[in-house]
Swiss-Prot record:
Free-text tissue specificity from the UniProt record: Expressed in stems, rosette leaves and roots and weakly in inflorescences.
Organism of derivation: Arabidopsis thaliana (Mouse-ear cress)
Compositionally skewed regions (Polar residues) per UniProt: 21-40, 52-64, 105-120
Protein name (database record): Uncharacterized protein At3g27210
Quaternary assembly: Interacts with RLK902.
Bias kind Basic and acidic residues: ranges: 152-167
InterPro entries for this protein: At3g27210-like
Induction of its expression: Rapid but transient induction by wounding, salicylic acid treatment or pathogen infection.
Region (Disordered): 1-184
Residue spans of biased composition, Low complexity class: 1-12, 66-77
Lineage: Eukaryota, Viridiplantae, Streptophyta, Embryophyta, Tracheophyta
Length: 234
C-alpha cells in the first residue's frame, strides 16, 4: 500500500516541490526540465483568505463609511434629544375657555409649569372687566325712573282740558251774580261754542281754504273774457 501511494504521488501532474507558499513569490525547481515560475500578485491574492479580498483598502482622503446600524441612525429613528424632552413634559388639557384668555398680563398656562390652583381659584380679569356688572353701594339710592313720553293724542287732550278749565274760570269770573241753573247753561253753551271754533280752526289749519282761491280764479276768468275782442265771422 505504501509503494502504491508513493508511485501515485510521483505520477501526479502536480508535484509537492512545485507547491508555492504565500510568502514566496518565486520558486526554482531542481529539475532541469522545469522552467522558472514567477507568480504574479493576482495569483498571490487568490491564495489569501476571502475576507481580506473583500475588505476595502484604507484611504486617507476618504472618510470611513459608518455601518447602517450606527448610533446616529438609531438615534434619529427613535427621535432626537429635544423631541424626547418635549414629549416627556405633559401638556395641560382643559375644556374651559377661561384658561386661555389673557388680558393685561393675566396668566395663560402653556406647559404646566405653574400649579392648577393659580388659575382655578380666582376668575380671570377678562370677565371682571366686561361681563360682571358693577354692584351699587349700599348707601347710594336707586335712580329715579324716567318719565314716560306722552303720545300726540294725549297732548291734544291735555291742551283741550286746560283750555276748558281756563274758559270755565273766566266765565265764572265774568258772571259772578248768575244763579246756579243759568250759570250751568251758560257754561255748557260757551264750552260747545269753543269746541266748534277749535274744530273749525283745526280743519282750516290742516286743509287750506279753497274759497278764496276759487273766487279769485273766477274773477280773473271773467276779466279775460271781457277783455278779449269779439271777431265777427263773415
Amino acid at each position: 500500500m505504501g509503494s502504491s501511494s508513493s508511485s501515485s504521488l510521483n505520477n501526479s501532474p502536480i508535484r509537492a516541490d512545485s507547491m508555492v507558499t504565500p510568502e514566496s513569490q518565486m520558486t526554482v525547481n531542481d529539475n532541469k526540465n522545469d522552467n522558472v515560475s514567477i507568480l504574479s500578485p493576482s495569483v498571490k491574492k487568490s491564495f489569501e483568505s476571502p475576507r481580506k479580498s473583500t475588505s476595502i483598502p484604507a484611504n486617507n482622503n476618504l472618510t470611513p463609511v459608518k455601518s447602517r446600524w450606527s448610533f446616529s441612525s438609531s438615534k434619529k429613528s427613535f427621535g432626537s434629544k429635544d423631541e424626547t424632552f418635549f414629549d416627556s413634559q405633559p401638556w395641560l388639557q382643559s375644556d374651559s375657555d377661561d384658561d386661555f384668555h389673557s388680558v393685561n398680563g393675566d396668566f395663560t398656562p402653556s406647559l404646566g409649569n405653574t400649579p392648577k390652583s393659580s388659575f382655578s381659584d380666582r376668575p380671570p380679569r377678562f370677565h371682571n372687566l366686561i361681563f360682571h356688572e358693577k354692584k351699587p353701594s349700599r348707601g347710594s339710592s336707586s335712580p329715579a325712573p324716567l318719565p314716560r313720553r306722552k303720545k300726540l293724542g294725549e297732548l291734544f287732550r291735555d291742551s283741550i282740558r286746560e283750555e276748558r278749565e281756563e274758559s270755565g274760570s273766566s266765565s265764572a269770573i265774568s258772571t259772578p251774580y248768575l244763579s246756579g241753573a243759568n250759570s250751568r247753561e251758560f257754561n255748557d253753551t260757551a264750552i260747545e261754542k269753543e269746541e266748534k271754533k277749535k274744530s273749525n280752526w283745526h280743519h282750516h289749519r290742516c286743509l287750506p281754504g279753497f274759497s278764496s282761491c276759487g273766487g279769485s280764479f273766477m274773477e280773473r276768468r271773467k276779466k279775460m273774457s271781457s277783455e278779449t275782442p269779439v271777431v265777427a265771422v263773415k
